[in-house]
Amino acid sequence: MRVKKRNVRGNAKNFITRSQAVRKLQISLADFRRLCIFKGIYPREPKNKKKANKGSTAPTTFYYAKDIQYLMHEPVLAKFREHKTFARKLTRALGRGEVSSAKKLEENRSTYKLDHIIKERYPSFPDAVRDIDDALNMLFLFANLPATNQISSRVIRDAQVICNQWLAYVAKERLIRKVFVSIKGIYYQANVKGEEVRWVIPFKFPENIPSDIDFRIMMTFLEFYSTLLHFVLFKLYTDSGLVYPPKIDVEQDKILSGINAYILESQEETSVLNAEVPSDAPDKEAQSIDTKTLAQAMKADSKDKDDNSNDEAPENVEDVELDEFEDHNKNKGDILAQPSKFSSPTATLFEDFVFYVGREVPIEAIEFLILSCGGKVISEAAMDQIEGNTEFDLSKVTHQIVDRPVLKHKVAGRTYIQPQWVFDCINKGELLSANLYLPGVSLPPHLSPWGDALGYDPTKEVESEDESSDSSEESDSEIENEEEDTKPAAITNEDDDEDVEELAAQKELELEASGIAYSKAKDEGLHDDVASKKKRKVTDEDEEEKKLKMIMMSNKQRKLYKKMKYSNQQKEDKIEELKKKKKQLAKKEKTLKKVEKK
């Protein structure tokens, strides 16, 4: 009999511990973490940890052995090893006091790029767009952090540039769909190339950075995400015919830095401008033109001049307008109406409006949303920094956004609103009444456009007292009928027919006693009773089927099913409680209105 070797198959072969992986790759633990983040490799959980760890029960981190084998052929791994030798040589040179050799080493240090990793992980562009949610969240987080010993100002500045380029593109293409102001920040959702992208921008408050955060891991993620976003933005800008990276208006950036400072130019305009600008240094190919070719070009130029002189000789010739003929036989039904550039209703929501934003309103969020919906913005904070205010025409202002309770002076012809009006209009996809958002008025609740975790919809209207009483009576009658009906769930067709006949006879007697013709009310009352009877039968059959399925479940599945039922019941109870509170509030409001009328 052949002896079976232990720990050579199954979990022991498929999984490898982290310490074994580090020894196999011959790099430090920090470099191993960076490499795993770049390549998208994360720890795995084997079914049997004891077998995977070759009999040991010590807590360890496992990876797939094939993933580690895949990392061994990574070009970035060689760059990490080169950097390790560079650091060793640099410390040796500095220790000896050889400053010149240290400078040479610093100038010739090896660098790596993540371009090939981006192409490997995201073979198609929709895959990259689908995965930029986390990238945007990380970059907007770093863009709002202060510079510290662990985070350099260059990193924060680069993150701010990428974030502003993203916002400028979304505003230019009018891709915003939903927005929600929460405690954490402002959530945005945009439709980019058919993919829903959602990200959060934190509020610009002074941040207290905790001391227990590992910024090395976060900086590694930031490095990868910034490279990914550069790829995505380049593709988005070029597909839209825009120049990437966009130019920055220095004067506008000094006044009020934001997406208004970015100039989005089309590639056609820049190509025309480059063609018009004469080149100072002629090309080498242009210098080596043959004399024969030059003579042919001079002859062609002379011919063109003669033709132009002949064409320009008759000066007083009247312009003759040619008749235009229409083809009436052409089938106009074949011509399809082309859709507009902005198909979403939110894209043209504020197209005819000019907003004057007060200095107390956060300009970054409001400006981005208004520009994304086609509106124009005039900021009071920007006007304060410009002397003379000659660039702004305030006569075209239609709406003024105010976030203060009382206004001393009001301009006729303007609609005064609070900032929440902009958010709610975008979520609804239509212009809401401005009377609900006047300055100093208590605002309606700002609800999440993505719904509640419980599934409760507070926008639904409260049922009236008559409807609620009718529904309660119906439920009571159903409960009574269920209590009376003590028959088992498996009812035969013969029993159903007998029950229907008994119901019909009883209904006929009741109608004769009340003086109503049975033939008139037969189709109304009898069918309702039969339908309710059949409905109860279906519910009983469903309950019986659920019981049979639970019997066939394993103990683990049964426990999981009970937990799910318990959590769902808790959600339903919470929803019912909220509905009751809403009904009570509606009743109080009605009574108060009645008292005020009296």
Curated annotation (Swiss-Prot):
Coiled-coil zones: 557-598
Keywords tagged on the record: Coiled coil, Nucleus, Ribosome biogenesis, rRNA processing
Biased composition (Acidic residues): 463-485
Chain residue ranges for the region called Disordered: 296-317, 452-501, 515-544, 564-598
Localization per record: Nucleus, Nucleolus; Nucleus, Nucleoplasm
HAMAP family in UniProt: Pescadillo (MF_03028)
Protein name: Pescadillo homolog
